[in-house]
């Protein structure tokens, strides 16, 4: 599923661009994911587990963009990926009202309002798809994430 791009202003006045990831983002996306995993223990994998090739990541990004059950957006600042988030929808009749969300943001971009803005986008997308219940994984001790989740109504 593709995301309709938009530009937002951050707390520090910088502009951030939200868009669907491109297949050509694959190498940068792998670097981004590895850096996120290195910067915080709250990402669900270790840096050494980020072993996908650029081709595998490119195929994944193309797949998510064509998917009817998922959407990803990246936050680009000054031409570089600063964050990403994803909504994965359920396809079974019994659970179609549910979706899971995930978010990642490089440490140097924390406290600029990006996480809040990405969450607002994910919530709007989910509501538009008829989702009534959003779910996420919370890792004990992740105080920053807990604060964001509570602020967003989780």
What label would you give each PLM region?
Residues 16-28:
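A short beta-loop-alpha structural element at the N-terminal edge
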Residues 119, 126-137:
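Conserved GNAT acetyl-CoA-binding A-motif
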Residues 109, 113-121:
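Conserved acetyl-CoA pyrophosphate-binding loop and the N-cap/start of the following alpha-helix
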Residues 20, 31-48:
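Helix-loop element at the rim of GNAT/NAT acetyltransferase active sites that forms part
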Residues 136-146:
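Conserved beta-strand-loop-alpha-helix junction that forms the acyl-donor binding cleft
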Residues 37, 49-97, 102-106, 119-120:
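Acetyl-CoA-dependent GNAT
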